[in-house]
């Protein structure tokens, strides 16, 4: 009874993409990173660091970021690392990249968010599986002197044990979707207003909310 209409009505999601057997979070990250670098007009040597946010890396090591580094020919003497912060991973990635550039030098950072969550879900659990898909996005950032506001509210300590999620590969991801939805609807407007206050901007000046 989990029809397309059921999913769209309750989530607003109309389309999701899943990896083929030959694809992974790493291959998606490489494809997105190549496109971002090409569109930036920069050369691989211009990238000062590579940060990849993912919780579904195909390998314990090497990291997805290091696989991107090798595939794109980024300098080997520049930092490349993964971070795991789930939904907020890309935002953390921006902050980590800014810190790396400011500390170690460099002008440009490649930040990637990629997931292959279809490999980690139970297709019979519609409270979770209808919400997630597979994909990757990448952006090249330039270090600037303008203010950078990042508002975070950590709730990463809540754990729902479902037979062994703490042991990689032993159980699918399980989530209380309704509770997460209620939290997101309440938290997002508060975060937006906090960031606007910190950057002395108004809502009328915002073109996109992603």
Task: Describe the predicted segments one by one.
Residues 7, 29, 36, 47-50, ...:
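Buried hydrophobic positions in well-ordered alpha/beta secondary-structure cores of metabolic enzymes
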Residues 1-22, 123-186, 190-194:
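Condensing-enzyme catalytic core mediating Claisen C-C bond formation in acyl metabolism
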Residues 98-133:
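Flexible, glycine-rich active-site loops centered on histidine and acidic residues
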Residues 4-5, 43-49, 76-79, 107-108, ...:
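Short acidic capping loops at alpha-helix termini that bridge into adjacent secondary structure
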Residues 4-27, 55-108:
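Conserved catalytic cysteine-centered active-site region
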Residues 32-48, 190-207:
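Phosphate/pyrophosphate-binding loops at sites that engage ATP/ADP/AMP, CoA/4′-phosphopantetheine
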Residues 51, 110-112, 139-141, 210:
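Structural motif
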């Amino acid at each position: 009874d989990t029809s397309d209409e059921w999913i769209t009505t309750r989530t607003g999601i109309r389309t999701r993409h899943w990896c083929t057997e030959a694809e992974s979070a790493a291959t998606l990250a490489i494809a997105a990173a190549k496109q971002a670098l090409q569109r930036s007009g920069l050369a691989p040597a211009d990238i000062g660091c590579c940060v990849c946010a993912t919780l579904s890396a195909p390998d314990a090591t090497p990291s997805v970021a290091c696989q991107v580094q090798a595939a794109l020919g980024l300098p080997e003497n520049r930092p490349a690392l993964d971070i795991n912060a789930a939904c907020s991973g890309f935002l953390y990635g921006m902050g980590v990249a800014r810190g790396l550039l400011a500390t170690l030098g460099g002008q440009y950072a490649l930040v990637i968010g990629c997931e292959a969550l279809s490999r980690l879900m139970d297709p019979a659990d519609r409270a979770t599986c209808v919400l997630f898909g597979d994909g990757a996005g990448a952006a090249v950032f330039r270090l600037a002197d303008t203010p950078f506001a990042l508002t975070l509210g950590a709730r990463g300590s809540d754990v729902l044990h479902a037979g062994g999620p703490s042991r990689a590969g032993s159980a699918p991801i399980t989530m209380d979707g309704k509770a997460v939805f209620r939290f997101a609807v309440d938290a997002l407007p508060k975060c937006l207003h906090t960031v606007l206050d910190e950057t002395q901007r108004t809502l009328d000046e915002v073109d996109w909310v992603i």
